[in-house]
Amino acid sequence: MYDVVIIGGGPAGLSAALGAKKKGCGNILIIERSEKLGGILNQCIHNGFGLHTFKEELTGPEYAFRYIEMVQKENIPFLLNTTVLSVSPHSVTYINQEEGVRVIETKSIVLAMGCRERPRGALNIPGDRGAGIFSAGTAQYLTNIQGKMPGKRVVILGSGDIGLIMARRMTLEGAKVLAVVELMPYSSGLKRNIVQCLDDFSIPLLLSHTVTKIIGKKRVEGIEVSKVDEKKKPIPGTEIFFDADTLLLSVGLLPENELSRKAGITISPVTGGPVVDNSFQTNREGIFACGNVLHVHDLVDYVSSEAEKAGENAALYALYDRKEEKKVIPISVFGLARYTVPEMIHEDTKEDTTIRFRVSNVKKDGKIVVRINGEEVISKKKRIMAPGEMETIIISKRILDKYDSIESMEVGTED
């Protein structure tokens, strides 16, 4: 029997394994469905990773390699080319070419499956279905891993971070990026990516616009873009035609939670990921979740720190049989805060607790407020908050020590 089985060998899975090892777990297994560890980082050859974790700027493969080296140094075993079919609180069923279908027993499980891109089918874009329509991640894989150019004249729908980064990558590879088109009146990517990927390369960003028609039977021959009103409906007469041969879609990421749903884990309708407490445990005892399977992060450094905590808690659960009934208090949100992760906190929490959330709209000169038992304990001024940037607030042990028990907690924004 394993102490901890980790599903996913990307940055979250690797960090969770190291966290479990740090707490004294000797019997750990990482299961990865692709042919190598590292997850999505292997195709992210741009820099900007590791500034928080390693205090230096790394590319995605360099960041992944450091964690793979640490995992190998700790002699943590892993399975590659292995697909998990189902999980339950104390067993994992997987399949691979060497062993066929196998069921293994484990004391705890960490879900670290990451996320996937929203496909074209979810967007209902009218027009033809010619070649030349890619998700931004697929275009990234073709360009960075396979060395193939998806197209020469490109329009990008959606201003998520992958779309912004691919606007720069396509330009550097010799393509002409005609425009990045965003439905919302604000970008959904990080401010630094807008500056480094669009402004520095003079790529136009069309806010409150969307693609209203794709032209081209065999291959994309043109893209029609229209301005939208407050209800996100295209405004007749505002059409712009782009002579493009490629459309890249960067229209959001979806946490990969088919296994979680099959296991009976409660999924948040806001994040699309499991509902967890401040130990990252789900409603199914012994099953923990971390990384982009939980909610989509801005920075891999945040994924690593969160996953390490999840791994540590999974190890403590496995080693010390931590199954006592603990009362958990839901964290409620107010103002522009859409959700929090974690969504619940143990009433007797006495350690620094990190709360992450996103706002529903751009807010300037506001503040983040935390209330415990109705009393305001944190008020942090923010010059600007935007949906594309995740907000982080740390509730210190010093604050939590003042309360014998937590009856209510609220996190939100105020003017």
Annotated model-derived regions:
Residues 68-88, 92-94, 104, 171-258, ...:
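A Rossmann-like FAD-binding core segment of flavoenzymes
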Residues 133-143, 246-297:
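FAD-site-proximal beta/loop scaffold in flavoenzymes
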Residues 1-3, 58, 80, 315-415:
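Rossmann-like nucleotide/phosphate-binding core characteristic of flavoprotein oxidoreductases
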Residues 1-7, 64-153, 229-237, 248, ...:
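FAD-binding core/adjacent interface of flavoenzyme oxidoreductases
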Residues 17-19, 42-43, 122-125, 167-169, ...:
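Short amphipathic alpha-helical segments
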Residues 2-66, 70, 141, 150-194:
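Beta1-alpha1 glycine-rich phosphate/pyrophosphate-binding loop at the start
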Residues 290-334:
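A conserved FAD-binding loop/helix module that cradles the flavin
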